[in-house]
């Protein structure tokens, strides 16, 4: 099974990156998380397979680069965006359900 320190080759590490489009709007610097963590597929363990309604031979697991902390900023009078202040690898939203 993969450990949390596994990085995809050729993909930059999960970190804050300045969003130049929003930073140039005169409200200060805006940062967003970017980069990779990992995505891996492996054979489903037999004990897990026995509990599945529809048994699958392959299990996939993915970690995405997401904001650990952020705050909302209003731009153009009514558009709210999130300014990320810290990033980490966490379960991807589409894998949580």
From Swiss-Prot:
Record InterPro entries: Cystine-knot_cytokine, Glyco_hormone
Compartments it resides in: Secreted
GO biological process assignments: G protein-coupled receptor signaling pathway; positive regulation of steroid biosynthetic process; regulation of signaling receptor activity; thyroid hormone generation
Keywords: Disulfide bond, Glycoprotein, Hormone, Secreted
Residues bearing glycans: 57, 83
GO CC, one annotated term: extracellular space
UniProt-recorded Gene Ontology molecular function terms: follicle-stimulating hormone activity
Disulfide-linked positions: 11-36, 14-65, 33-87, 37-89, 64-92
Family the UniProt entry places it in: Belongs to the glycoprotein hormones subunit alpha family.
Subunit structure: Heterodimer. Glycoprotein hormones are heterodimers composed of a common alpha chain described here and a unique beta chain which confers their biological specificity to the different hormones.
Purpose: Shared alpha chain of heterodimeric glycoprotein hormones. These hormones bind specific receptors on target cells that in turn activate downstream signaling pathways. Involved in gametogenesis and steroidogenesis.
PANTHER family the UniProt entry points to: GLYCOPROTEIN HORMONE ALPHA CHAIN, GLYCOPROTEIN HORMONES ALPHA CHAIN
Protein's recorded name: Glycoprotein hormones alpha chain
